[in-house]
């Protein structure tokens, strides 16, 4: 199929894929939508395994259908829902020999290094790791403490970081704006 065609094409040009992204909302409260999302994650994991991609990456969502920021994103309830919904995806990744890597983002459920560490510890799988993007841990409310936040992330998550994504930011109109 298509996956094997891509695998041959990438091999022909000596290309490797570092991460296959699957940025869907594992905290979607709509049960039917969530079921489809979980199946989509599993399809991405299968596709990654066929392509020889070691990592499927994702962010950590929001407890609403719109995948938008709200204060509830940082609640204990949202974190518990995310962990519960992530668990079967990671179990499938284990079976397929693929790493599932979550990317902490300030506006999402896993918004800081401590919450990321908790997800890793509660799921307890070597197939769950971290995509570390330091700028994603920052917001207008905390960017002036960026050195402390980034150092804490490396200390708390360092052994479980699968990938690092580097970018910069500027403050514009009272908000952080990511720049390449």
List PLM regions with ranges.
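Short loop/turn segments at strand-loop or loop-helix junctions that form parts
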Residues: 22-25, 59-63, 168
């Amino acid at each position: 199929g298509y996956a094997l065609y891509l695998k041959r094409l990438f091999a022909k040009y000596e290309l490797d894929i570092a991460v296959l992204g699957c940025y869907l909302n594992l905290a979607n409260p709509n049960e039917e939508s969530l079921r489809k999302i979980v199946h989509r994650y599993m399809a991405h994991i299968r596709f990654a395994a066929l392509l020889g991609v070691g990592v499927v990456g994702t962010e950590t969502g929001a407890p609403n259908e719109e995948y938008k920021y709200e204060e509830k994103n940082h609640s204990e309830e949202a974190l518990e829902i995310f962990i519960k919904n992530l668990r079967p995806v990671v179990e499938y990744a284990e079976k397929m020999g693929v790493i599932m890597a979550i990317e902490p983002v300030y506006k999402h459920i896993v918004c800081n290094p401590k919450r990321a560490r908790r997800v890793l510890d509660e799921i307890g799988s070597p197939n769950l790791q971290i995509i570390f993007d330091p700028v994603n841990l920052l917001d207008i409310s905390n960017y002036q403490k960026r050195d402390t936040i980034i150092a804490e992330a490396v200390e708390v998550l360092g052994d479980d970081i699968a990938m690092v994504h580097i970018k910069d930011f500027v403050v514009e109109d009272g908000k952080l704006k990511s720049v390449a």
